[in-house]
A protein has these predicted regions:
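C-terminal catalytic domains of large/alpha subunits in multi-subunit enzymes
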Residues: 1-45, 86-349
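Conserved strand-to-helix beginnings and helix N-cap segments that scaffold or border functional pockets
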Residues: 80-81
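Structural motif
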Residues: 65-70
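Active-site-adjacent "gating/activation" loops or surface patches in catalytic cores
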Residues: 47-63
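Gly/Ser-rich, acidic/histidine-flanked active-site/gating loops
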Residues: 73
Length: 349
């Protein structure tokens, strides 16, 4: 819960929603029959642990359209959609005149390694800052007064929380307004400041900028097949509900594959199986997945959006294992699980 100490010594911030994810699936767990498993997980946003962790974004206005160039690859998490929505919100400009470009070293600023689990928070904040600079420039170009106040974040170092006055926040711009800034560029950067592992002299080091939390429940039929997976995720601010639910559903199915069917045999580090024989979970075997996004005021960057990435698959396998333990009484410590209706012939390693 907020204010308690995480295993790494960091204080859980006010955005922590693990308890809420448990509450959200409580009735499902207790009223879905005898063969039910449950598991929780947390996942960091950002590289953290004192390593360089930048989000960088460059906005170019041409032809009354804002062009987004960010050093963040879209690897399935929908970063282009997230950035488009954040830039639209921050600039007060229509989504129809905002275009995200695939990242290129020729046009996008270098933002370090590509890690999907940090783009919503770090690159999203960089995009917000760049869009705010564009918004201020447009206020000045149109002779409007921009009024806002800023206060330091209560728990993120070197972060100021800005709030526009009601009159300023009500101003929205059109494509014709954006054309007034044709040929201009705006840059946004956010550095997720964290402490290195083993930092001495600091009782509660900040290992990561933010964390997401999740609880998954696996429900089995009498014959041992999976009836349903329920996945509740604390993601801070929900940016795009449909994309978020798709991420949760896809990651949960991946977790089912890890738990039940996938085998990745190696010979001195070299894979020996073909893609078709790895045992990826087949579509006709996929159970229903009930995705429950939990929205809670997030951290003081990127409008509180933490996002969702690898965490969607992390608690699935232990939840599945717990359900099968209640089904056949066997406590298993290796995956894929044995003795299930999905079990395949073991591949020699």
């Amino acid at each position: 819960r907020p204010g308690q100490v995480l295993p790494n010594g960091q204080i859980a911030d006010p955005a922590t929603g693990l308890a809420e994810t448990l509450e959200a699936v409580k009735d499902t767990y207790y009223h879905s029959g005898p063969y039910v498993g449950i598991a929780c997980a947390l996942k960091n946003a950002g590289v953290g642990v004192g390593l360089p962790d930048y989000g960088r974004c460059r906005l170019v206005v041409e032809g009354g359209t804002i062009h987004i160039h960010a050093g963040a690859s879209c690897i399935g998490q929908g970063v282009g959609t997230v950035l488009t929505q954040i830039v639209s919100q921050a600039a007060g400009a229509p989504v129809s005149h905002i275009r995200w470009h695939n990242p290129s070293t020729a046009t996008a600023p270098d933002a370090g390694t590509t890690s999907g689990s940090r783009q919503t928070t770090l690159t999203g904040e960089a995009g917000r800052r760049a869009a705010k600079a564009l918004r201020r420039a447009l206020f000045a170009r149109k002779g409007l007064v921009y009024v806002s106040s800023s206060t330091p974040s209560a728990y993120l170092e070197d972060v100021m929380v800005e709030e526009e006055s009601p009159e300023t926040a009500a101003v929205r711009f059109t494509a014709e307004d954006l054309a007034l800034l044709d040929g201009t560029e705006y840059y946004g950067e956010y550095y997720g400041k964290t402490d290195a592992m083993g930092t001495s002299g600091k009782e509660h080091p900040v290992s990561h900028v933010a964390y997401g939390y999740a609880t998954h429940v696996c429900i089995l039929n009498e014959d041992g097949t999976i009836k349903k997976m329920v996945a509740c995720h604390d993601v801070g601010k929900v940016v795009n509900p449909r994309s978020l639910e798709g991420q949760i559903e896809g990651g949960t199915i991946m977790g089912c594959g890890y738990a039940l069917t996938e085998q990745y045999p190696l010979d001195h580090g070299r894979p020996t199986a073909k893609y078709g024989t790895l045992g990826l979970f087949r579509a006709d075997k996929a159970p229903d997945v009930i995705a429950i996004p939990l929205e809670k005021k997030g951290v003081d960057v990127s409008y509180g959006a933490i996002g969702v990435g690898e965490i969607t698959s992390i608690p699935t396998a232990p939840a599945v294992a717990g359900a099968y333990y209640r089904w056949n009484g066997e406590f298993q410590t290796e995956i894929p699980l044995k003795g299930t209706p999905y079990a395949r012939k073991q591949v020699k390693k």
